[in-house]
Amino acid sequence: MAALEDIYLPYKPKRKTRASMAREKGLEPLANLLLKQQPVDVETEAAAYVNEEKGVKDIDEALQGARDIIAETINENAEAREKMRKYFQQNAIIRSRVYTGKEEEGQKYKDYFEWEEPLKDAPSHRVLAMRRGEAELFLMLDILPPEEEAITILEKQFIEANNSAGEQVKLAIKDCYKRLLSPSMETEMRMLSKKKADEEAIEVFAKNLHKLLMAAPLGSKRVLAID
């Protein structure tokens, strides 16, 4: 299902984004040029798109808009999203911190005031406890892997040349990861970990209930029935 959603993502109706506003300013050709990473003078190319009437005041704004478009393009790339999904599944760390000033009131969550562990190894009862602490505004929770390695994975996919255009794409990759891909993947990990924890909790409850229902109602006592 996630893979299908990735394929549909570029065509999904969306609210106004930084990339869509940059496109409205006519900066998409510049973004496409940068993505090709040809040996061009980036500032000279960007200067051609400076247009105060369209809201592009200088070269920096032209390049920023182009990077916004590139960032959205990378975020909507199905292959990149699948790589990030697998990376998060294998390497995400669930971290819990107490809100400053909530230490005394949130004592029942004291075990999670300063806690972290690999998400894939976290037992369901711990995940659910941390989520409750977050919902009750005692804990801050995040589910993230090491950032540098994630960015390196994206750079291996999208960086094709060591030149000024490639440097612009690198900047767009970092922005894409921090602003778009990482929050999206974290949301997925939250949903998946919640579903897994709920299913495990239900399974434990069902087993305990089965034992209770199958137990002798009067304990180990002899019972005589006469018909």
Question: Which residues does each PLM region occupy?
Answer:
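Duplex nucleic acid-engaging cores and interfaces of nucleic-acid transaction enzymes
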Residues: 1-218, 222-224
